[in-house]
Amino acid sequence: HGRGMKHSLPDLPYDYGALEPHINAQIMELHHSKHHAAYVNNLNATEEKYREALARGDVTAHVALQPALKFKGGGHINHTIFWTNLSPNGGGEPKGELLEAIKRDFGSFDKFKERLTAVSVGVQGSGWGWLGFNKEQGHLQIAACANQDPLQGTTGLIPLLGIDVWEHAYYLQYKNVRPDYLKAIWNVITWENVTERYMACK
């Protein structure tokens, strides 16, 4: 990014209350307007410091800033995907080539759903469960990432569907019962978006 190329908070493609009753408006508003906004603001500030360190030739400083870039940049990347993976018209099953690929790589849609649910529920502490595409091998893979580690930068997989299992994504509604949140989120996942991502990278 050149100077003045700042990251900005993307608009949600729906209202804060649109995913009710599965994810309530209070969670969506805080998650988007506070949590995601903070990642964007902090990413911009960190990139500015990083550019200054590079300009000074200060290798120590720019190495020291890399974990912050990964965390804040990952937070921005991950949430930007997450919002578009969700829709009030979500739920159901994918169709066409994505469904065929899911059946090929996981046996059935239900088996895939069970597997991604188990991986997401099993994340220790904060993190994400992902459906990704392994371009080299030409197949779908499920992976978990810690904290805000971005899927592609961490595993090389291209992100298709992300499930945020940070407590801020569900605690106000589901308390400490992460499996209940996972059960609910399948009702608002939009397979159209996941399919678009799949078709664009395969």
Swiss-Prot record:
Location in the cell: Mitochondrion matrix
Modification N6-acetyllysine occurs at: 49, 95, 103, 111, 183
Residue sites binding Mn(2+) per the record: 31, 79, 164, 168
EC number(s) reported in the record: 1.15.1.1
Keyword Acetylation included in the entry's annotation: yes
Main location: mitochondrion
Pfam families given in the database record: Sod_Fe_C (PF02777), Sod_Fe_N (PF00081)
Cofactor binding remark: Binds 1 Mn(2+) ion per subunit.
Reaction it catalyzes: 2 superoxide + 2 H(+) = H2O2 + O2
Cofactor(s) the record lists: Mn(2+)
Organelle targeting peptide span: 1-5
Record-listed 3'-nitrotyrosine modification sites: 39
Post-translational modification: Nitrated under oxidative stress. Nitration coupled with oxidation inhibits the catalytic activity. Deacetylated by SIRT3 upon exposure to ionizing radiations or after long fasting.
N6-succinyllysine modified-residue sites: 49, 103, 111
Gene Ontology CC annotation, any one: mitochondrial matrix
Recorded GO MF terms: manganese ion binding; superoxide dismutase activity
Keyword Transit peptide: yes
Keywords: Acetylation, Manganese, Metal-binding, Mitochondrion, Nitration, Oxidoreductase, Transit peptide, Ubl conjugation
Family: Belongs to the iron/manganese superoxide dismutase family.
Function according to Swiss-Prot or TrEMBL: Destroys superoxide anion radicals which are normally produced within the cells and which are toxic to biological systems.
Subunit structure: Homotetramer.
Name of the protein this chain belongs to: Superoxide dismutase [Mn], mitochondrial
Organism name: Oryctolagus cuniculus (Rabbit)
